[in-house]
Swiss-Prot record:
Molecular function in Gene Ontology: O-phospho-L-serine:2-oxoglutarate aminotransferase activity; pyridoxal phosphate binding
GO cellular component annotations of the record: cytoplasm
Gene name linked to the record: serC
Residue sites binding pyridoxal 5'-phosphate per the record: W101, T152, D172, Q195, N237, T238
Known role: Catalyzes the reversible conversion of 3-phosphohydroxypyruvate to phosphoserine and of 3-hydroxy-2-oxo-4-phosphonooxybutanoate to phosphohydroxythreonine.
Protein name: Phosphoserine aminotransferase
UniProt keyword annotations, A-Z: Amino-acid biosynthesis, Aminotransferase, Cytoplasm, Pyridoxal phosphate, Pyridoxine biosynthesis, Serine biosynthesis, Transferase
Pfam families: Aminotran_5 (PF00266)
Organism annotation: Burkholderia vietnamiensis (strain G4 / LMG 22486) (Burkholderia cepacia (strain R1808))
Cofactor section: pyridoxal 5'-phosphate
Binding residue positions for L-glutamate: R41
Pathways involved: Amino-acid biosynthesis; L-serine biosynthesis; L-serine from 3-phospho-D-glycerate: step 2/3; Cofactor biosynthesis; pyridoxine 5'-phosphate biosynthesis; pyridoxine 5'-phosphate from D-erythrose 4-phosphate: step 3/5
Amino acid sequence: MRVFNFSAGPAALPEEVLRQAADEMLDWHGSGMSVMEMSHRGKEFMSIHETALADLRELLDVPASHRILFLQGGGIAENAIVPMNLLGWRKSADFVVTGSWSQKSFNEAKKYCTPHLAASGKTADGFTRAPTRAEWQLSDDPAYVHLCTNETIDGVETFEIPDLGDVPLVADVSSHILSRPMDVAKYGVLFGGAQKNIGMAGVTVVIVREDLLDRALSICPSAFEWKTVAENNSLYNTPPTYAIYIAGLVFQWLKRQGGLAAIEARNIEKAKLLYDTIDASGFYLNKVEPAVRSRMNVPFFLADETRNEDFLAGAKARGLLQLKGHKSVGGMRASIYNAVPLEGVKALVEYMKDFERRDA
C-alpha cells in the first residue's frame, strides 16, 4: 500500500515516475540494458543526459548566459564548492542567514574566506523571518552574496529577490527548485540537491552564469571546478547516471502537469489548506511570519508537546508518514513537495482536526 510521504528529503516521487522506472529497469527502450549498466559516454545514456538538460532548461527558462551542470556531493558539499569556485582574488563573501541551512553555508565558508553576516532572520523564537533588502548590510566588495531561498528545517521561504547589480547572487534552492517559476537571470549561481523536488539523492544541480566560470581557487578539486565540469558537459568524472535518469523522468512529468506555473498553483493550494488549518486551530502553531512561510516545508508545534509521539503514531496508522520535525527544532514538519498530492494534504488536515478534537 502506498502511503502519503511528508519526508523533507529524500522525499516523495511522482508515482508515474516510479512506475516508468520500474517498467524500464531491465531494458531501457529496447537497449537490453538497465540505465544503471550503461556507459556514461554511450549513445543511450547520452540521449538521457542531453534530454534532461534540455528539459530542465525549458522548465526553468534558463537563459543562454547560464550553464546547467550535474554534479555530486549534495547541497552540503556545495557550501564548500561555491566559495572555492567564486572567491577568486577576493577574501570575503556576504551571507543573509534565514535559517539552519544558510547558517551551515556561512560556517563552511569560514574555511576559505572571512564571511560577512549581512543580515539574519533569527528571533527569540528561532528563524521566523526573512530580512528585507533594506536590512542587508553588504560589505564593500564581496565575491558574492549567499542566500538560501527556502529553509527546509525552519520553513522560511524568500520570494522577493533583489537586484544586486554587479555582485553575483548565489542561492541554495534545494528544497523549492521547480516548485514555482524563477527569474534565473537574477542569479549568478543556483544550486540544489535533487532529493526533494528534482528526483532521487545522488545528483546535484548547479546553474551558473558563464562569466563566473573563471574564478576558481587553485585548491578547488578538478571534479568540482565548475569550468572543468562545464567544458566536459558534466562528464569529467563518471556522473550519477541513474539519478540523472530519474531527474529526467521528473522533468518530463512536470511538463505533462503543465509546467511550473501550473505546479505553483497546485502548491499554493496545498500550502494554504495546511496553514489555514494551523492558524484556525487553538492546538497547532506555526511561528514563521505569514509573508515568508514556506510552501514546501511546513513546521508546526502541538500546544501540548507531550502528545507528540501520540500524534505521530496516529498519523502512521492513517498512512501519513515522516512528519517528525527536525531534531534541532522539534515539533512536526510536513514537507509538501510537488509529488505530494492535494489528497495527501487533505488527509493530513483531516487527521489534525480529528486529533485536536480528541485531545480537547
